[in-house]
Amino acid sequence: MSGRSVRAETRSRAKDDIKKVMAAIEKVRKWEKKWVTVGDTSLRIFKWVPVTDSKEKEKSKSNNTAAREPNGFPSDASANSSLLLEFQDENSNQSSVSDVYQLKVDSSTNSSPSPQQSESLSPAHTSDFRTDDSQPPTLGQEILEEPSLPASEVADEPPTLTKEEPVPVETQTTEEEEDSGAPPLKRFCVDQPVVPQTTSES
């Protein structure tokens, strides 16, 4: 009985949340994807956030600065740190995203780069990804470290196939016997009669 009531309660709560979200969607005209910190934790997620008008932003900023700086100092350090977190959330991944975009542009403009070019491109881009090792990687940054592959592997062209000449069967068997490391097998010739060997050495 208690399980059903709990499920019904969460269902009704979810319906209320959906109604709130739908009402907010109707009011908001523009949305954008942003990195957002979840509560007081250090967990960050990439989600759709309503875009506030620049006028509203200016009003909220002016109200915050007037309320916080009567003496020229912030009223509390926690508010200042939350502002710093918001600033980092907005700008933290833009540089690495632009690096990845630049890598994709480079690989698309060079349709068939030579191996020397691809080797020279990849170390430069991997050093860009390693520049912010002072901060632990977040959920979004782990994905961005993948494009450290050479540009030749990232290119959209399919690999070219080369035609090899077939090797005669006789040479294949001799190579296999030599490579196996085992003693050579006895070979029988069809043309010559088989003569049993007698070991008369004593």
UniProtKB/Swiss-Prot annotation:
Region (Disordered) residue ranges read 53-202
PTM-bearing positions, type Phosphoserine: 114, 118, 120, 122, 127, 148, 152
Q: Which Pfam families match?
A: BCL_N
- What GO cellular component term, any one, is given? chromatin
Locations of Polar residues compositional bias? 90-99
> Gene for this protein?
Bcl7b
Q: Which family does it belong to?
A: Belongs to the BCL7 family.
Q: Which UniProt keywords apply?
A: Apoptosis, Differentiation, Phosphoprotein, Wnt signaling pathway
Q: Mind telling me which InterPro entries this protein's record contains?
A: BCL7 (IPR006804)
Q: What is this protein called?
A: B-cell CLL/lymphoma 7 protein family member B
Species the sequence originates in: Mus musculus
